[in-house]
Amino acid sequence: MENEIITVACPTCGSAVIWGEQSPYRPFCSKRCQLIDLGEWANEEKRIASDATHSDSEEWSEVDDR
């Protein structure tokens, strides 16, 4: 089973991608798909779901001026 070829779907376009050294952008099929995904995260079109009911800023503490 060492030589088993693992194939995954590109998260952006769905193309088949071989999971190995020959696919430098894995799990993406290309640099283009990788950058599209990065842009979606940067524009907050994608986010990690949370059950938090408060703002993250509520947990921030003031900087201690020593």
Curated annotation (Swiss-Prot):
InterPro entries: DNA_gyrase_inhibitor_YacG, Znf_NHR/GATA. Zn(2+) binds at C10, C13, C29, C33. Keywords: Metal-binding, Zinc. GO terms for biological process: regulation of DNA-templated transcription. The keyword Zinc applies. HAMAP family: DNA_gyrase_inhibitor_YacG. Belongs to the DNA gyrase inhibitor YacG family. This is DNA gyrase inhibitor YacG.
